[in-house]
Structures are given as structure tokens and as C-alpha cells.
Amino acid sequence: LGFSKGNNIGVQHAKGEYLCILNPDTVVPEDCFKELFEFSEIKNDLGLFACRLIDGTGTFLPESKRHIPTPKVAIKKMLGFIKSYYATEVEEDSTGIVPILVGAFMMVKTNVYKQVQGFDEDYFMYGEDIDLSYKVTKAGYDNMYYGPIKAIHFKGESTLKDSVYAKRFYGAMQIFYKKHFKSNRLTKTIISLGIKMAKLFKGHTSVEKMPVNRYVLISDKNYPKLAEIFKNSFQIQTKIEVFQANTQVILDANYLSFKQIIECMSASEKNQNITFKILPKNSNFILGSNSSKNRGEVIHF
């Protein structure tokens, strides 16, 4: 079906005042929607709105807030100057108007979504969130980024980080420029260069596996089968604290709220090789992702 068509079908069956577009590889805190709803009620002319996204290591995902990828911005992005692509003028933990939000998690009033005719089904995958954000802005609404709320987007599970991704992205930009910008030699050159550069990608980029010296389960319960997997390097504690370098932290959702889990991941030292796994409620497996560039891992016990 593709991302656009699949979501539009869902919207046809939705009956609420608000719509939430949410990827399956996400984790949201318990108070997420309550806080976003309260925020939406005090903002006039609200278009799309969304929260801060982090990856499976707790690292902020800059695509949470972006600028319109005009031909000039696209050229800079291809040359490695990404500051103009991301909306860095809005701090990641603050709130502000941004042109483009990410399709992994966005909310919008149903009437606004239908007014701009929803996701454009000419896009199969990639670019549809840019197109929707741009249409909503052109209709006179403000797209809002709400940084106080954080959610996890594992990302590597729904994104192809290789030549296929690059080709699809620049193909989507070709559609975007045809629909919203006057076609000229410059835009055609940008797309042509983007597609040519995509062919130079050598496929999936592996991320170096970092050493893990200890495994710490945050829980009030013992899981003997889980302990067997990690042997002598496994320990259990009930409090979240500052972890030593090269530690993998296993967060038990039977004991911790998702808000606590997300806060723990977000607050971790990013240069200490602290990684995370989540033990979902009533489950016999842990899962997580040590890089937004690679697929995650599921360990059964």
C-alpha cells in the first residue's frame, strides 16, 4: 500500500477529533497524549504538532524538526551542511513553530488533515511527511514542535539506510519539487545529482559493535533465565543511577513506567557507551537498538 495510502485508509475509519500518525517502532510515555492535547487547546491556528524523538540510545533525532527542503537547502544537505536542513533555531527541549515534522509521530485535528486532503498518495515511502507539513503551512496553520515530551523512535526498523533509501528519498524530492516548486534546470540538476550520489552508496553501513562489560537489570524481580544469558556480568538493582561506561541497562516495564524508561535513556551519558534494552510487560524477551543506523535486537529468554 505504501505509507501514505495506508494512513489515509486508517483516517477514513477514524472517528475522533484528532488523528495520530505513529510508527510501530516507537515507544511513548503514559502522559504523552494528555500533555499534547492540553498544549493543542491553547494554540490558535494549530496545524501538525509533535514531540521530541530520541533513538534507542537516548540520542535526540534532529529530524524531529526540519526546514522546508528547498533546492538551496537540498544542495547544502548534499554537501554535508545539514544545519540549514534541521530547525536548529528551536532548542530540542523547547517549543516552537517549525516548518516540517516527521511522520514517525505527528498529531493533527481531523478537519485540518482532511482540508489539505491528507497524505499525497503519489509518495510511496519518504517525503510524504514533508509534503503534508508543507501543505498544512500553506493552508495558514502553524506546525508546532513540543520538546518537553519525549518518545522513542528506534528508526532503524523502518528506515533503509542504504542506496535504496537514498534513491527513494531523492525520488520523493522529485515529486515534491514538481508539486510545489517551479520546475527549472536547478531543481532537475539537484535531483539528478542526488540520484547519482545514491548509486555510490555501498549498501547497509555497519556500526562498530562496542564492548559491554556489565548488564544491569532495573527491576524489583529476578529473572533467572535472563541472568543465565549474561552469566557473571549480570546484576539487578531497583534504582536508576549514573551507570559505568560499557554498561547495557535492561529496563523492566513491569517495574518502571515508560516515562521513567524514556527519561533514563535520554539522561544517559552519550560518550560512555551506555546501551539499553527494554523488557516489555508480561514478556519473555528484551529488545532495543544500539544505533539508529542499524536494525535492533531481540533476545528471548
Where do the protein language model's features map onto the residues?
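Glycine-rich, basic loop-to-helix element that forms the pyrophosphate-binding segment
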Residues: 1-14
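Conserved donor NDP-sugar-binding/catalytic core segment of glycosyltransferases
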Residues: 26-63
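The conserved acidic donor/metal-binding loop of glycosyltransferases
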Residues: 23-27, 253-255
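Short, flexible, basic/aromatic active-site loop/helix in glycosyltransferases
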Residues: 68-98
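Active-site-adjacent helix/loop segment of glycosyltransferases
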Residues: 134-139, 143-209
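Short aromatic/hydrophobic "clamp" motif used to bind/position activated sugar donors
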Residues: 19
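Acidic metal-phosphate-binding loop of nucleotide-sugar-dependent transferases
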Residues: 1, 26-27, 123
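A short, conserved alpha-helix in the catalytic core of glycosyltransferases
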Residues: 93, 99-149, 265-266
